[in-house]
């Protein structure tokens, strides 16, 4: 049950990060998704 919750939260973070950082440059971080590049965001950076 806890694993499912973690996966749902992780997906939400990725979606929010992608929507917020589209077209930007830099790193995508867990704490500051506004600093990110466009593309697929991970918890470390963007591709």
Swiss-Prot record:
Which residue pairs form cystines in this protein?
none
| Annotated signal sequence range | 1-19
Q: What is its main location?
A: secreted
Any one cellular-component term (Gene Ontology):
extracellular region
Q: How is it modified after translation?
A: May contain 3 disulfide bonds.
Q: In which tissues is it expressed?
A: Expressed by the venom duct.
- Give UniProt keywords alphabetically: Disulfide bond, Neurotoxin, Secreted, Signal, Toxin
Q: Name one GO molecular function term.
A: toxin activity
Compartments, as annotated in UniProt = Secreted
This protein's domain notes: The cysteine framework is C-C-C-CC-C-C.
Q: Which family does it belong to?
A: Belongs to the conotoxin O1 superfamily.
Function statement: Probable neurotoxin.
- Name assigned to this protein: Conotoxin Cal6.18
- Source organism (scientific name): Californiconus californicus
């Amino acid at each position: 049950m806890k694993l499912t919750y973690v996966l749902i939260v992780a997906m939400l973070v990725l979606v929010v990060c992608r929507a917020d950082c589209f077209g930007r440059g830099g790193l995508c971080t867990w704490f500051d998704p506004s600093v990110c590049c466009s593309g697929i965001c991970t918890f470390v950076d963007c591709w």
